[in-house]
Swiss-Prot record:
Keywords: Brassinosteroid signaling pathway, Cytoplasm, Nucleus, Ubl conjugation pathway. Pfam families: Beta-prop_KIB1-4, F-box. This is F-box protein KIB3. It is found in: Cytoplasm; Nucleus, Nucleolus.
Length: 450
């Protein structure tokens, strides 16, 4: 065996040893830290592939967003009801207290900051995508947005997000005053917003995007479905109305209407509210489906069977692996989100709950998440954490165990031949800075900031 063959074999053994070492560290981490650590570098990402038993959660989680005047405004709180575990996600590099979460898709969140800028934020990888400005929309003249008296943010009544975890393609829909604007990124096509022309000047009450179709309730109380499977230009498919046929008389407090699409593609209208004005009054819901004869939502249903409904996502999911059947997972309504009312504030204190449709009763509450915390939370959402095959490698403040492992990995690399790789640049920061992988040299990290 030649010297070069011996060195190559030795290098392969050392590389395998490092991967094994990293895998042992990854197996000790919590679920959240595991998915944070897998994006440290390509070595950690490869090692994470061989860790057994780490999969996407089968039950929805709760995310809580901090209110203003908190010490660590770059953090948020996660709660896994199935495992009864709480996680604090810190150092997001994003001011969560002065921003609003408008929608989510998997682990991606559509954030709207105080400067009226949109961002897509992945909680676990810290990846961030800045969306185009709203000042000009597809040739439209500058739109006059409705602002609160404080002038702190633009009022957006409703938004929807869909992200493909593998390709990073996405759709974003927003209701801006009487417009519904949307932005679609596929490949390198990522430069503008467009107005949904068929419903221009109508506005919307709620909308859901599922399987390339946008389901939308307009302010005129009509349901319209648009098919985006052909690309950016939608095709209007069908229309129905619900109007006064949906029962709201049972609610004495302000009620709200939501749209949901079941596993079979059936559209539901959900109306919720409180029976009286007392703080002790619980949320109640009415669920209606369409009458095929009249094309109106006049059929009151008492059960959705072996499915569960997540109002924040506007979809139903199979009731299995810990997901409760015939239930509505509810967190907050659009009125309180827009007003920024604290989740610990009187009427809003018990918003996070699971409501069983058949029994017409709240079967699970999560008041302890807010009342036991010294930090005020302005909003909460149900979401399904998902982790795609891609990772955007970053430098951030790491878990102490990860830091210790990286030091050990670095010490084991001493004396090995440096590896040279081509420089690649990934733009992912709001301020225009770039995260890039530099050519490596002995004893130096592969990732740096320019």
């Amino acid at each position: 065996m030649s010297d070069s063959d011996g060195k190559n074999m030795e290098g392969r053994f050392e590389a395998a040893y490092i991967v094994d070492l990293v895998r042992l560290i990854l197996e000790r981490l919590s679920f959240v830290d595991f998915h944070r650590a897998r994006c440290v570098s390509s070595t950690w990402y490869v090692a994470s592939k061989s860790v057994i038993g780490v999969t996407n959660p089968t039950t929805p989680w709760i995310i809580l967003f901090p209110n203003k005047n908190v010490e660590n405004n770059g953090s948020c709180k996660l709660f896994d009801p199935h495992e009864n575990k709480t996680y604090i996600i810190r150092d997001l590099g994003f001011d969560m207290s002065t921003s609003r979460c408008l929608a989510s898709s998997g682990s991606w969140f559509l954030m709207f900051d105080h400067r009226a800028d949109f961002h897509l934020l992945n909680l676990f990888t810290r990846e961030r995508i800045l969306l185009p400005s709203l000042e000009s929309i597809d040739g439209e003249r500058y739109m006059r947005f409705k602002r609160p008296i404080s002038g702190s943010h633009i009022e957006i009544d409703k938004a929807v997000l869909w992200v493909d975890d593998k390709s990073r393609d996405y759709f974003v829909f927003c209701n801006l005053s009487s417009y519904v604007a949307y932005h679609h990124k596929r490949g390198d096509d990522n430069n503008s917003w467009k107005v949904l022309q068929p419903i221009k000047h109508q506005g919307c009450v709620d909308m859901v995007f599922k399987e390339s179709k946008l389901y939308m309730i307009s302010a005129h109380q009509c349901l319209t479905v648009f098919d985006f499977s052909g690309g950016v230009s939608p095709v209007e498919m069908e229309c129905a109305s619900f109007g006064s046929s949906v029962c709201v008389n049972r609610f004495h407090m302000k009620y709200f209407s939501n749209l949901a699409v079941t596993l079979s593609g059936e559209v539901l209208i959900i109306v919720g509210g409180k029976m009286d004005s007392s703080p002790e009054a619980k949320c109640v819901f009415t669920v209606n489906k369409m009458d095929p004869k009249s094309s109106e939502f006049t059929v009151l249903i008492k059960s959705i069977g072996d499915e569960a409904l997540l109002l924040d996502l506007g979809i139903t999911v199979p009731a299995k692996d810990g997901v409760m059947r015939d239930c509505i997972y509810f967190s907050n309504d659009q009125y309180h989100r827009c007003c920024g009312i604290s989740l610990r504030d009187g009427y809003n204190a018990d918003r996070i709950c699971v409501y069983q449709i058949g029994s017409d009763y709240v079967v699970q509450e999560f008041e302890h998440l807010t009342t036991s915390s010294t930090k005020l939370f302005k909003d909460a959402r149900w979401f399904f954490p998902t982790f795609g095959d891609k990772c955007c490698f970053h430098l951030w403040i790491l878990h102490p165990v990860i830091l210790q492992a990286k030091k050990l990995q670095k010490s084991n690399l001493k004396g090995t031949k440096p590896v040279t790789r081509e420089k690649t640049t990934i733009v992912n920061n709001v301020d225009g800075t770039t995260t890039q992988r530099e050519k490596t040299t002995k004893g130096k990290n592969m990732i740096g900031k320019k």
